Amino acid sequence: MTKHGFLLATLVLAGATLPIGPVTAATPEEEQAAFQAYFKQRFPNVPEDEFKNGTYAIDPVTRENWEAIEEFPPYENAISQGETLWNTPFADGQGYADCFPDGPAIMNHYPRWDRERGQVMTLPLALNACRTAHGETPLKYKKGPIADLLAYIAFESRGQITRVEIPQDDPRALAAYEQGKRFYFARRGQLNFACAHCHLATSGTKLRTETLSPAYGHTTHWPVYRSEWGEMGTLHRRFAGCNEQVRAKAFEPQGEEYRNLEYFLTYMNNGLELNGPGARK
């Protein structure tokens, strides 16, 4: 089996009916189509634009509770603090707006392939690159001010459509996508689980009292206020938590492993509307 066929073969094993060609000739575009088709088939009564709501798209009981929480969302303070941070000048008199001239509504520009650096550029990484370029200390990546900044940016970006690109003229971009894909399907930890075990093959089923959320929609609503955390947190904080739940060692937030994973997973979610920040259990 070729590396391009890995995702499609996994979807076949998970029970998907794939309206595309042989698994040995799959492109990222074909893999994306198969990924999205799998979830539409698995949850035929869920409108496509509802997948951005995660578990709440497939579980009416938890959705009712979530809608009640959204009446007075716990992330409102983070949005306000993030706006203040965005508008506060650095010591040199410059600010985030000087690095991001399009304004704060830039969530759908990331993650992206940075040809000059030869790596996946995420929004948190870009925010810290802006800070260090102006002599500021970089922010920590899991929570705190970075989550507040992201909450404000996400709020300003609501309604944008996920649109990650894999440049065809730079094989390094495809390699990063492939590495992210392999991370997603690799077993790890004492429990020997992969991301796909919970969020693809058994999505929608119960694990103890929790409904396992579908991977289609996983990247639309970050950062989130999780009741379990009692505060805002970033996507890479959640990646680390998932690794730890299967008793595997977590990787560094914004390290290559998680950035490539984000690149792959966000590409799989292309076409979905961004609706962050979010609230989760």
UniProtKB/Swiss-Prot annotation:
Modification(s) after translation:
Cysteine persulfide at Cys-242.
Against Pfam families, the record matches this protein to: SoxA-TsdA_cyt-c
Binding positions (heme): C195, H199, C242
Q: Name one GO cellular component term.
A: periplasmic space
Locate the Cytochrome c domain: which residues? 175-281
**Co-factor note (free text):** Binds 1 heme group per subunit.
What cofactor is needed?
Answer: heme
* Sites where the protein binds substrate: R238
Cystine bridges: which residues?
Answer: C99-C130
Where is this protein found?
Periplasm
Signal peptide positions (record):
1-25
Phenotype of the disruptant? Answer: No oxidation of thiosulfate with a simultaneous deletion of soxX alone or together with a deletion of soxB.
Q: What GO terms in the biological process aspect are recorded for it?
A: sulfur oxidation
Please give the superkingdom of this protein's source. Answer: Bacteria
Keyword Repressor included in the entry's annotation:
no
Write down the chemical reaction(s) this protein catalyses. Answer: L-cysteinyl-[SoxY protein] + thiosulfate + 2 Fe(III)-[cytochrome c] = S-sulfosulfanyl-L-cysteinyl-[SoxY protein] + 2 Fe(II)-[cytochrome c] + 2 H(+); S-sulfanyl-L-cysteinyl-[SoxY protein] + thiosulfate + 2 Fe(III)-[cytochrome c] = S-(2-sulfodisulfanyl)-L-cysteinyl-[SoxY protein] + 2 Fe(II)-[cytochrome c] + 2 H(+)
GO MF terms listed in the record are: electron transfer activity; heme binding; iron ion binding; oxidoreductase activity; oxidoreductase activity, acting on a sulfur group of donors, cytochrome as acceptor; protein heterodimerization activity; transferase activity
Q: Which family does it belong to?
A: Belongs to the SoxA family.
Relate the protein's function as given in its record. Answer: C-type monoheme cytochrome, which is part of the SoxAX cytochrome complex involved in sulfur oxidation. The SoxAX complex catalyzes the formation of a heterodisulfide bond between the conserved cysteine residue on a sulfur carrier SoxYZ complex subunit SoxY and thiosulfate or other inorganic sulfur substrates. This leads to the intermediary formation of conspicuous sulfur globules inside of the cells.
Its recorded name reads: L-cysteine S-thiosulfotransferase subunit SoxA
Q: What is the lineage of its organism?
A: Bacteria, Pseudomonadati, Pseudomonadota, Gammaproteobacteria, Chromatiales
- Which gene carries the instructions for this protein? soxA
